[in-house]
């Protein structure tokens, strides 16, 4: 097979792999505006009159950039150099929550069991925080009391109450952004689909393989909107510990039927 000009149908997915065992540690499937870039430093070699004899290039670099259509927790963890923590029954995650609850018979019931003491609740008026009430041993005109998930509001209070608290969850995910942790080197494979230019029913599988890559953490922007994209950039690197010919590879482009 000796293919040349093809139609790039789409970049199907991208995976990040652990350098130690090759396991997949992240996968993206909604890639937009993918771009593969290479660059090198050039130096002009001239004669005594300044005429160009040749040009030498060195320090070649490779980079892949794209936007993921959806917010990705896997990508966020890789960008922050963090682990994706999964909660369980034996290792729960503390989750902050806010609730707006309607007073019924002088009480409100929280959706979750608080993991720590709730010291304040707030009366809402026109959707805004109006009056702050403090925890007491028993409900009074200025204090509320709490038993498990049930709060007895101050005497005579009706309407909406705002409560902010924390609870333990066995069904949660957490990614921490530490000031002292940065992205680690990973393997990268980008899977694409090509079509024959003369017969679009003939398809080819394309793969971009980088043995070593690192997510660029110099500037990470995560759009916190429904229509925002999760952008990222990966720098490809040669393997300095591999003295073979393949060790100098930044990446390979492979196309097969």
Sequence positions of predicted segments:
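Extended beta-strand solenoid/passenger and fiber regions
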Residues: 74-141, 166-187, 193-204
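Beta-strand elements of well-folded, non-transmembrane domains
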Residues: 68-72, 167-169, 192-198, 212-219, ...
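Short, ordered beta-strand-loop transition motifs
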Residues: 57-59, 100-104, 140-148, 224-226
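Solvent-exposed edge beta-strands and adjacent loop segments
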Residues: 1-79, 132, 206, 210-231
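Extracellular interaction modules
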Residues: 58-63, 153-162
